[in-house]
């Protein structure tokens, strides 16, 4: 497999083409750093999806969502209230440590589907608002009404066969899907689209980006991709 270029999340933030996009990227940096600085959040929130592709693999197509997975089931340390409280507390600390002057607060959270034991693959959905301190937008943020938000989709009871450490700085990192798991996840998504009679061109674009950039994937890596795909399908099922 081709060697992956080194990356720096601060470079990604500074490469923003507009002021609004830079604020969004600063908020992403703040959220990821907040998760990295909390031992329980870091151990259980595995980054995947478009934001990982953007930061780690230089994709230019992504939404204002951050996707995470964990093999843990609902209950114990993994509850809607527990995750929200831990993230909010860690955000307060990280807002002060980073020099962006940007505040971030969890504005809402919910469990989907509902808090019913029959749903074995729920997600914790959160919306994190952000605004620069000293602005009128910050007043709206403090009342949890910021129009500028980042959605977090935290999937529980998901297979995470191969993970790696995504470095945020010299001291901290966040756990993330490996390249093989990202490719396997995209293939699983395509299989789901057939069964659900839906189409998402974004997944095809992402697969093309990864395969073009790392086209010399050897048989060992192909085997890891297949094993990851089988684990994902076995854990949640093709219809999951």
What residues fall within each predicted segment?
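Compositionally biased terminal segments of proteins
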Residues: 1-240
């Amino acid at each position: 497999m081709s060697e992956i270029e080194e990356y720096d999340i601060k470079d990604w933030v500074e490469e923003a083409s507009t002021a609004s996009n830079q604020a969004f990227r600063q908020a992403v940096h703040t959220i990821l750093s907040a998760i990295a600085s909390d031992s329980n959040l870091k151990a259980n929130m595995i980054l995947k999806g478009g934001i990982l592709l953007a930061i780690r693999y230089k994709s230019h197509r992504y939404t204002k969502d951050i996707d995470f997975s964990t093999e843990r089931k609902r209950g114990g340390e993994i509850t809607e209230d527990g995750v929200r409280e831990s993230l909010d507390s860690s955000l307060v600390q990280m807002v002060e440590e980073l020099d962006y002057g940007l505040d971030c607060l969890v504005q809402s959270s919910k469990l989907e589907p509902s808090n019913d034991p029959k749903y074995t693959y729920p997600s914790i959905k959160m919306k994190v608002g952000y605004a620069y301190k000293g602005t009128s937008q910050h007043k709206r943020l403090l009342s949890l009404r910021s129009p500028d938000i980042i959605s977090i989709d935290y999937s529980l009871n998901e297979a995470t066969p191969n993970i790696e450490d995504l470095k945020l700085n010299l001291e901290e990192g966040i756990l993330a899907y490996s390249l093989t798991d990202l490719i396997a996840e995209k293939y699983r998504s395509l299989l789901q689209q057939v069964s659900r009679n839906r189409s998402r061109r974004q997944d095809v674009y992402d697969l093309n980006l990864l395969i073009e950039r790392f086209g010399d994937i050897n048989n060992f890596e192909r085997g890891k991709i297949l094993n990851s795909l089988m684990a994902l399908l076995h854990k949640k099922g093709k219809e999951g």
